[in-house]
From Swiss-Prot:
Protein species of origin: Saccharophagus degradans (strain 2-40 / ATCC 43961 / DSM 17024)
One Gene Ontology MF term: RNA binding
The protein's name in its UniProt record: SsrA-binding protein
Gene transcribed to yield this protein: smpB
Superkingdom classification of source: Bacteria
Gene Ontology terms: biological process: trans-translation
Major localisation: cytoplasm
Intracellular or extracellular location(s): Cytoplasm
Keyword annotations of the record: Cytoplasm, RNA-binding
Any single Gene Ontology cellular-component annotation: cytosol
HAMAP family per record: SmpB
Length: 159
């Protein structure tokens, strides 16, 4: 069978999502950043071994770093050196975006969270967002709105 006749499996471009960020924060401005990874990390991400539940972005010395993202190594991929699953990874942004992020982080109540990790062509990209923390009553309001939208859909579907 030639290579032209082989069918490729459609792969989802999303590697990992931080659903907790959508629950705990109001996400305002979003940015797309490249991620500087090692070879074993790319292999592990291709095997869907990434996790972003408590990841955030730290700005130090004019550079952005992804903190708290876990990439579990494959046992066969990294036998000759020590791997660190939770190491800080550098985010690749242009200067204008870095300045906006640093300025927003200095405002009271704002933080920078990583919302998702995905493939764009053959590169790993990270979507980051400027976020403001939600209070308990904000979370309840969001839940009520979500339930109301579900009820509206049910009524429209029944008709």
């Amino acid at each position: 069978m030639s290579k032209a006749n082989k069918k490729k499996k459609p792969q989802s471009s999303t590697i990992a999502q931080n659903k907790r960020a959508r629950h705990d924060y109001f996400l305002e401005t979003k940015f797309e950043a490249g991620v500087a990874l090692l070879g074993w990390e790319v292999k592990a991400l291709r095997a869907q071994r990434g996790q972003m539940t408590e990841s955030y972005v730290l700005v130090q010395n004019g550079e952005a770093w992804l903190q708290g993202a876990q990439i579990q190594p494959l046992p066969q991929a990294c036998t000759h050196y020590v791997t660190e699953p939770a190491r800080p990874r550098k985010l690749l942004l242009n200067r204008r975006e870095l300045n906006k992020i640093a300025e927003a982080k200095d405002q009271k109540g704002y933080t920078i969270v990583a919302t998702s990790l995905y493939w764009k062509a053959h590169m790993v990209k990270c979507e980051i967002a400027i976020a403001k923390g939600k209070q308990l009553h904000d979370k309840r309001q969001t839940e009520k709105e979500r339930e109301w939208n579900i009820q509206k859909q049910r009524v429209l579907y029944d008709k």
